């Protein structure tokens, strides 16, 4: 991130309670640091050996809907105050969630993820995304636990 760029906080979202908590936390942090948010969701085609996956499912559309619902859920508490001014953009991609997050956060000021995923995209997560990004990210990483966990 260059000195003239607005700070960006990248947040991994998968629809799980933990990722929504991460997004809520990131909104508060963005308000404190005059940063914007990029909410990121990634998906894979299901991997079932010997069983074809349904070709009538639009995974990109499903991911986009999950991301939009997560942003709304996290934004409900920010109708007033400094959090209301936080700009949130979204990014949907096909690929391994950890790699997509690492790519998107290469120039970010912060990467925020939940401690547990496996929301509506359990089949897309092949391992511990939070563990992978904490070891490989080029920016600071914050891992948020779901308060109800």
Task: Name these PLM-found stretches.
Residues 1-5, 18, 76-111, 148-149:
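Structural beta-alpha unit
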Residues 38-40, 89-93, 142-144:
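General small-molecule cofactor/ligand-binding pocket signal
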Residues 40-69, 91:
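Acidic, proline/glycine-rich short linear motifs
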Residues 104, 108-149:
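Gly/Ser-rich helix-loop-strand patches that form or flank binding pockets
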């Amino acid at each position: 991130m260059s000195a003239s760029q607005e700070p960006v906080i990248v947040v991994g979202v998968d629809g799980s309670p933990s990722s929504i908590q991460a997004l809520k936390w990131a909104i508060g942090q963005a308000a404190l640091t005059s940063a914007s948010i990029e909410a990121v969701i990634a998906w894979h085609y299901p991997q079932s050996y010997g069983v074809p996956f349904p070709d009538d499912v639009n995974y990109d559309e499903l991911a986009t809907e999950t991301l939009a619902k997560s942003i709304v859920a996290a934004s409900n508490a920010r109708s007033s105050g400094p959090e209301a001014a936080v700009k949130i953009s979204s990014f949907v991609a096909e690929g391994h969630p950890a790699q997509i997050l690492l790519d998107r956060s290469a120039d970010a000021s912060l990467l925020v993820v939940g401690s547990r995923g496996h929301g509506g995209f359990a089949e897309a997560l092949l391992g511990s995304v939070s563990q992978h990004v904490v070891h490989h990210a080029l920016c600071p990483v914050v891992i948020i636990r779901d308060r109800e966990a």
